[in-house]
């Protein structure tokens, strides 16, 4: 099979709104079946072709290239016809396609999933559909490297477009200018208006992985609209956004241009009006005068205050900028064009028209014949500025024209002026005489050094050097000079040097390395949900260059420079948020419980139930016999007057508070449901509240969480008081919750006298947030440790890092308290009741420790009226956290009893630091660990806990132990690898019936590439007929793929005998493309205390001892927790039909005490071991549900609106194991 595909002489990259300097005015591409792919692409410089026809002037963010081609039928008419059919189907799709031989490869941006921090790979198949395989693995890179490179550029352009559109970024000379800042940026805290310029970078990592991140440049620009006296800035060189042109400010008042408003709106997304302020400017390259919106004019200067009179004399060097075609980087005085103006006037009278025919188009420049400002336009709906004239000789200057396989057919191109798309410079509205073009023979070119520097500053991948043969330059004739323009839109051969800071402070090393920005630049899975994936926790930029100048420290706060969260994404303007968040004490209150812990404490009990519960939980996997002797030291004293809420708030305000929950250390798998953090208020608030409250009140239902409550009770009753006479009838739901994954955050560290972003954060990190936004607060600090001799030097070194970073972020000062207590790091006693010591070691520690009464006395006598911060350095253990919080509460209570009313709650703060923060690979070989210390001064409060308005907090409870990536890493590999035991794809056919009226079926493949849903009304047909239609749809889909398939049919709800017989007798057609096996089962929901008690006694799955039905297989069942089981029917006819599945949120309902359970039963398993099939189903369910929560995209293998979460601990442990055989219960 052989045929030729001829892409006729024309491929153009559309003028993207953010990279005006990267234009391809004309090019061409031809691919013969006997020409190697890489050779053809390197030769012509065009990689991927989209066959979407140019139908609109609107920029399409999902399509990069446009092409016109025709299929030349040579040897095979059918193949050419097939390709044409594909072209017709894809004509109106936002795709990028590539034709080779008889294959048509399609890149579809809509189909690419958005999975931050996870991996997904894909390959283009001959069907044109997506299938995530190994496109970017090393063995494929040799052949598909060009496709790969261009695809990366497509990703980059898409991300750039949406940054500009959604976040009000402004493209300026090929880089980005973030304009959306905190609302107080312009009015409250800042007295300078510098905007750091960032560059979107992409890098190619090992195994074909790619990553995006924002990188700082040395440029800082200032909005001309924020200059108080514009008259003083006349004749000042400015930069025009988004074109990037250099211009001179000639007038502070000018008429608006409707043409410019329209162009900026449709091509750049700027919603401007003609009523906004406009200024008159003159292009430096051509002396063309016109008007421009004031808010899109910028000054380029060093970090000086705007009221500095020497501003114009401190302009930064612009030689490193990438300039568009109509700009040259040398300033010309207006007097230079006096004679040209006279000549232009004569030519205007003669009414000349000049045409020039090029390799791909005929460009006609037509001047206006009126006294109004001149319009230069091409003879089409498009227009071009007067400075543009294409030179065909320069277009092909870098390669031999005689070797060009297209030049012999150049007359057949059929390209017209309409194929060119230039930005229209506005009409000149100033009252000055216009200058007509004067085509002289003079030519001005950029120096080679400038060109090279310009290329080196481009935002490209540093690792791919495959385009040496692409034409680097094209010369464009302007009115009296020739401008050399960079013509390499891919820029893949460029190495990006490390950016060094231009630092004015002599105390800061000028060669200091500035790490890359950590940027959650999300890749769009759909147009509407581009940035919804990181509507929490995402930090898109932070002005590190500004942090390096001392002037900025006087009024700088990181909080004022970070993009906001949910509200900002849906709005072009910032929504003022109240960052002063108070505790809601009622959140942890209950009408059934008093506010004082001591009132409910059992005076006869020798054990503090709070620590008792945690000791049980943290040791449940080690031994059934527990030593409770240490708990004796934690009895709450009757003299404590502070209530339960104070202790709870102290715990929840700490980084480590998650570890006080029983499920923290019990989860060992990698299935971290990070998206569940967003749903905190919906399913976790009440369990945590109940759990902590009941433990504080001594109720046993929150204590007995082990697998065998009876054995635990037995061990308790052997020598200790039982907390409850009756064993619990149910297992508390606290253990069923999963671990959390924290949103990405920017890390700041102070190292080598420079505050910068840390791109290599370790696993252990902390967040420090001591006051609301916009406040500066000083603290007197006490450093306390339960092991002061061992941690003293490390703690002081750590504190100094925090102190310097805190001060340089202009948050205030942290002063190591100089009081009558001389120890720099004090020990604190974990034995609250020091009169009743039980251990010699504890006694020794207590004798040398600083008691809470002593600390309270020092605070009252020496620090009255000041803010005091207690730094507790603790072992990485929940027990120590609770002791430190209890110690802090005792200090507050003692201060209160001493009668000092000057200390308010906000004046006393606690911060717990785990000793594990000092752990590092080199910690055993060095005495100083400050170099390895990573401190997160995360004052941009976007904790998901705070999203719910009912929970107000001043400090967020950040997750401590969580790795943090330095960049957003798109690892293009599969999130759901094929089962090593099976090796086939799985198609999940899941259906359910709503009463007896409606059947809903959903098809998903295990890789999330195929998903569809159909509804069948059972009034019109029997259920067997509906199942037969489902089977036909299934086989139709299977027959379209050349691969082996496992078909998994699962019903939600009990399966009737008629349904079972249908599936048991189902015949798999023999004419399918691959081998197909069938597995059939059902999922059922169980409710009630009786069923929940079985959960912790069941092994991950069990097999019944009896053979069921027709002896086809054993019935396998598995019990798992359900977060939500509901089937809302979107059809009006069935709105009143109650669903068969109950809705449950882990017993959050006040009136319900049961847990909803899900049993998965396998009835039929043809051609596969049923236990391996159950293993496969569980893995698919877990991973696909995980994807659904992470991406807001329904990749669930259950029908839509059924979100099943398998939370059980044994289940997750089973998923990480290699169990392949059943265990009978």
UniProtKB/Swiss-Prot annotation:
Component of the srb8-11 complex. The srb8-11 complex is a regulatory module of the Mediator complex which is itself involved in regulation of basal and activated RNA polymerase II-dependent transcription. The srb8-11 complex may be involved in the transcriptional repression of a subset of genes regulated by Mediator. It may inhibit the association of the Mediator complex with RNA polymerase II to form the holoenzyme complex. Keywords: Activator, Nucleus, Repressor, Transcription, Transcription regulation. Pfam families: Med13_C, MID_MedPIWI. GO terms for molecular function: transcription coactivator activity. It comes from Schizosaccharomyces pombe (strain 972 / ATCC 24843). GO terms for biological process: negative regulation of cell-cell adhesion; positive regulation of transcription by RNA polymerase II. InterPro entries: Med13_C, Mediator_complx_sub13, MID_MedPIWI. This is Mediator of RNA polymerase II transcription subunit 13. PANTHER family: MEDIATOR OF RNA POLYMERASE II TRANSCRIPTION SUBUNIT 13. Belongs to the Mediator complex subunit 13 family. The gene is srb9. GO terms for cellular component: mediator complex; nucleus. Its main location: nucleus. It comes from the Eukaryota. It is found in: Nucleus. Component of the srb8-11 complex which consists of rb8, srb9(TRAP240), srb10 and srb11. The srb8-11 complex associates with the Mediator complex thereby blocking association with RNA polymerase II and leading to reduced transcriptional activation by Mediator.
């Amino acid at each position: 099979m052989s045929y030729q595909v001829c892409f006729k002489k024309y491929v153009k990259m559309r003028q993207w709104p953010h990279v005006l300097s990267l234009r391809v005015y004309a090019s061409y591409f031809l691919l013969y079946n006997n020409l190697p792919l890489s050779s053809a692409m390197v030769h012509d410089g065009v990689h991927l072709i989209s066959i979407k026809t140019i139908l609109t002037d609107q920029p399409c963010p999902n399509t990069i290239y446009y092409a016109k081609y025709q299929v030349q039928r040579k040897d095979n008419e059918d193949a050419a016809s097939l390709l044409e059919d594909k072209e017709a189907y894809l004509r109106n799709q936002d795709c990028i396609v590539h034709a080779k031989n008889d294959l048509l490869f399609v890149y579809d941006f809509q189909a690419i999933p958005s999975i931050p921090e996870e991996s997904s790979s894909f390959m283009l198949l001959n069907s044109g559909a997506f299938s995530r395989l190994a496109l970017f693995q090393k063995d494929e890179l040799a052949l598909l490297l060009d496709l790969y490179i261009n695809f990366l550029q497509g990703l980059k352009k898409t991300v750039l477009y949406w940054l500009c559109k959604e976040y009000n970024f402004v493209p300026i000379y090929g880089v980005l200018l973030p304009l959306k800042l905190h609302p107080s940026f312009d009015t409250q805290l800042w007295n300078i208006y510098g905007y750091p310029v960032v560059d979107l970078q992409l890098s190619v990592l090992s195994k074909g992985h790619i990553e995006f991140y924002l990188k700082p440049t040395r440029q800082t620009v200032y909005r001309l609209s924020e200059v108080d006296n514009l008259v003083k800035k006349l004749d000042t060189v400015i930069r025009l956004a988004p074109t990037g042109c250099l211009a001179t400010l000639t007038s502070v008042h000018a008429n608006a241009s409707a043409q410019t408003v329209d162009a900026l709106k449709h091509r750049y997304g700027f919603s401007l009006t003609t009523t906004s302020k406009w200024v008159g400017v003159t292009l430096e390259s051509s002396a063309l005068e016109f008007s421009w919106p004031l808010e899109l004019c910028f000054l380029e200067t060093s970090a000086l205050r705007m009221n500095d009179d020497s501003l114009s004399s401190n302009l930064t060097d612009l030689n490193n900028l990438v300039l568009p075609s109509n700009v040259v980087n040398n300033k010309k005085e207006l007097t230079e064009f006096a004679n040209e103006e006279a000549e232009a006037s004569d030519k205007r009278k003669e009414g000349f028209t000049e045409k020039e025919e090029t390799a791909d188009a005929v460009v006609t420049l037509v001047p206006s014949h009126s006294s109004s400002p001149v319009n230069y336009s091409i003879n089409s709906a498009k227009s071009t500025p007067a400075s543009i004239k294409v030179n065909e000789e320069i277009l092909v200057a870098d390669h031999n024209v005689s070797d060009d396989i297209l030049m012999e057919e150049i007359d057949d191109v059929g390209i017209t002026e309409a194929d060119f798309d230039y930005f229209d410079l506005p009409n000149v509205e100033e009252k000055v005489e216009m200058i007509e073009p004067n085509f002289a023979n003079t030519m001005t070119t950029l120096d080679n050094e400038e060109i090279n520097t310009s290329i080196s500053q481009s935002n490209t991948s540093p690792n791919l050097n495959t385009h040496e043969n692409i034409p680097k330059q094209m010369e464009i004739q302007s009115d009296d000079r020739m401008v050399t323009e960079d013509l390499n839109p891919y820029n893949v051969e460029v190495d990006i040097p490390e950016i060094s800071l231009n630092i004015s402070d002599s105390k800061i090393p000028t060669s200091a390395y500035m790490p890359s920005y950590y940027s959650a630049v999300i890749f769009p899975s759909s147009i509407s949900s581009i940035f919804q994936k990181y509507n929490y926790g995402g930090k898109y930029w932070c002005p590190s260059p500004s942090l390096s100048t001392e002037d900025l420290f006087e009024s700088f706060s990181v909080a004022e420079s970070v993009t906001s969260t949910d509200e900002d994404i849906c709005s072009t303007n910032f929504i003022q948020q109240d960052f002063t968040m108070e505790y809601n004490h009622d959140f942890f209150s209950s009408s059934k419980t008093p506010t004082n812990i001591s009132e409910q404490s059992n005076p006869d009990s020798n054990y503090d139930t709070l620590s008792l519960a945690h000791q049980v939980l943290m040791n449940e996997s080690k031994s059934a016999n527990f030593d409770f002797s240490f708990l004796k030291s934690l009895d709450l004293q009757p003299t404590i007057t502070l209530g339960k809420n104070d202790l709870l708030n102290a715990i929840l305000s700490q980084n480590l508070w998650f570890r006080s929950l029983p499920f923290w250390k019990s989860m060992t798998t990698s299935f971290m449901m990070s998206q569940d953090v967003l749903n905190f208020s919906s399913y976790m608030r009440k369990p945590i509240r109940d759990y902590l409250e009941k433990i504080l009140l001594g109720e046993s239902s929150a204590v007995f969480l082990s697998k065998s409550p009876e054995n635990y009770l037995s061990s308790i009753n052997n020598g200790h008081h039982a907390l409850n006479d009756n064993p619990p009838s149910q297992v508390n739901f606290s253990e069923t919750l999963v671990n959390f994954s924290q949103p990405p955050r920017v890390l700041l560290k102070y190292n080598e006298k420079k505050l910068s972003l840390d791109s290599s954060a370790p696993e252990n990190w902390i967040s420090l947030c001591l006051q609301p936004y916009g406040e500066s607060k000083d603290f007197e600090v006490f450093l306390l440790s339960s092991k002061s001799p061992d941690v003293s030097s490390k703690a002081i070194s750590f504190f100094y890092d925090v102190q310097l970073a805190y001060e340089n972020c202009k948050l205030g000062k942290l002063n190591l308290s100089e009081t009558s207590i001389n120890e720099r790091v004090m020990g604190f006693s974990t034995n609250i009741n020091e009169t009743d010591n039980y251990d010699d070691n504890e006694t020794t520690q207590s004798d040398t420790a600083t008691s809470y009464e002593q600390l309270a006395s020092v605070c009252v006598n020496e620090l009255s009226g000041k803010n005091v911060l207690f730094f507790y350095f603790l072992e990485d253990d929940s027990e120590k956290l609770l002791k430190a919080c209890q110690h802090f509460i005792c200090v507050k209570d003692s201060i209160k009893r001493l009668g000092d009313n000057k200390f308010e709650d906000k004046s006393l703060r606690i911060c717990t630091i785990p000793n594990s923060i000092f752990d590092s690979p080199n910690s055993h070989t060095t005495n100083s660990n400050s170099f390895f210390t990573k401190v997160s001064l995360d004052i941009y409060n976007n904790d998901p806990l705070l999203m719910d308005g009912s929970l107000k907090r001043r400090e967020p409870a950040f997750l401590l132990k969580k790795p943090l990536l330095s960049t957003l890493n798109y690892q293009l590999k599969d999130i759901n690898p094929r089962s090593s035991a099976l090796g086939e794809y799985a198609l999940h056919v899941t259906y359910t019936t709503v009463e007896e009226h409606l059947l809903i079926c959903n098809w998903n493949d295990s890789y999330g590439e195929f998903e569809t849903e159909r509804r069948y009304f059972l009034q019109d047909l029997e259920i067997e007929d509906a199942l037969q239609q489902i089977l036909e749809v299934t086989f139709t889909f299977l027959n379209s793929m050349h691969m082996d398939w496992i078909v998994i049919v699962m019903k939600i709800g009990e399966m009737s005998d008629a349904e079972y017989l249908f599936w048991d007798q189902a015949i798999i057609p023999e004419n399918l493309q691959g081998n197909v096996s069938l597995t059939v089962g059902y999922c059922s929901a169980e409710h009630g205390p009786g069923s929940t008690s079985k959960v912790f006694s069941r092994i991950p799955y069990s097999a019944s001892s009896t053979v069921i039905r027709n002896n086809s297989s054993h019935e396998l069942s598995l019990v798992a927790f359900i977060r939500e089981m509901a089937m809302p029917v979107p059809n009006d006819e069935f709105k009143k039909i109650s669903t068969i599945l109950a809705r449950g949120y882990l017993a959050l309902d006040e009136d319900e005490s049961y847990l909803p359970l899900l049993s998965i039963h396998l009835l039929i398993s043809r051609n596969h071991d049923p236990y391996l099939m159950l293993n496969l189903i569980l893995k698919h369910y877990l991973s696909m549900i995980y994807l659904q929560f992470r991406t807001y995209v329904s990749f669930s293998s259950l029908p839509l609106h059924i979100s099943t979460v398998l939370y059980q601990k044994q289940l997750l442990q089973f998923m990480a194991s290699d169990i392949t055989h059943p265990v009978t219960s």
